[in-house]
């Protein structure tokens, strides 16, 4: 809405009676704000102005300005917060996350398409169509845009995260933001994401039509056509229609999830979680579950049918959000359901993994030469992208200093900095003040300027070099319904661990239910969920039995504290 310049009609100070009305409107529009917070937003005596303007499309908008920054705007009698206001109240709206690469498109007036979303470990926030939402970037929870949800969370998951997700109204760096002090978003609770995922998703944004701008009216149609073409094709050997095949697959995944993945302790269970975390993971290899291609079209309609068969009971525990509250595990359809056998390939892999005990990989830190450091390394025959060990970097620095006669004659522990070393190792403000550096500082600065990489060598396999830092095994505690705690562990595959085997071992050790589900926001990765706080058992398994170094495991501090004996 504010991607282009707007025209200001008037700018007036707000009177006392209008301030009181605005406070009441803010409290009604954002009920989660306390009285003190509302009073802080709409102060009694400080400067507060009303700016009436026309957006570039002709929309009449009223903007409320406090302390020189726009904090609210009103459109068609609806109040919306600006990014300036959301930076002080980041949890005011349900927040969805996207990639930093996407922001430029949003600022240019594009709407956010669902393929551009990053799904956090806790799942997507629960919203209904038309709800006001905030949009943040990976690495920072501070909102950079606000928009209106084009569909509910359930519909987003049912669609397989395809289509238009949010109609964007206002963004950081648009013309409304420019009318304020132009401050940058604060750093709030950064999200941890696998660098490999970030690179993969950047490539997907460039290739796929994730965003649809104002001029691209037919972008969503093209996207839906592309996804339909790449979806599940009808089996030519099956005489049934695609809809009939999808109905059977839907019921198979549903019954499989109830029989193997869901425990009584998991109830009540959000219907969106049932689909996203359980049913999708029960889909057989080579098939794709798409409810829209079934006769039910929507998950809610399918669950109504299952409720009529008295398999489950579904209730709306909060407005617009349905949950499965009861399951009849003695129902004939569940008891008679036969779990599909895995493929021969997966069976042989699992059997082979049982024969040999787990041995941890050898992980060696490496360094890549970036473009900014090529001048320093080209004398030794290296170029941009060359991968080096730390000892090699140290040797190259020493040889460079000696070859160019940079060792200080009066103090052999110091190295004089020539123009190449200055450009490569010093910050701009240091280049006129630092003329010499000790050897250790010289090498340390060089290592910090290089890009991280690592080499993983599994027993009996060839070494594999990857860019970025290896993601540690991540252990977190999450709160589920009725204040029940669960332990969630991710990134096991990076260390050659099979999540299914780890889950089975923990189930026996902890005497607690375990589930293996797709890790939200991580491509082709699984996470293990264990009932209760099982960090202590998990730590013993990883450290003492699997012999993984402690530095590659994060979250061990969440283990319950030992009770003191009286």
Swiss-Prot record:
Asked whether the keyword Iron is assigned, the reply is no
Q: Which GO terms describe its cellular component?
A: cytoplasm
Q: Which residues carry this modification: N-acetylmethionine?
A: 1
Phosphoserine, modified sites: 343
Keyword Oxidoreductase assigned: no
Give the region (Disordered) as residue ranges: 211-239
Report the residue ranges that make up the SWIB/MDM2 domain in this protein.
365-449
**Gene Ontology biological-process annotations:** formation of translation preinitiation complex
What is stated as this protein's family in its record? Belongs to the eIF2D family.
Task: Give the protein's biological function.
Answer: Translation initiation factor that is able to deliver tRNA to the P-site of the eukaryotic ribosome in a GTP-independent manner. The binding of Met-tRNA(I) occurs after the AUG codon finds its position in the P-site of 40S ribosomes, the situation that takes place during initiation complex formation on some specific RNAs. Its activity in tRNA binding with 40S subunits does not require the presence of the aminoacyl moiety. Possesses the unique ability to deliver non-Met (elongator) tRNAs into the P-site of the 40S subunit.
Question: What protein name applies here?
Answer: Eukaryotic translation initiation factor 2D
| Organism in which the protein naturally occurs | Oryctolagus cuniculus
Encoding gene per record: EIF2D
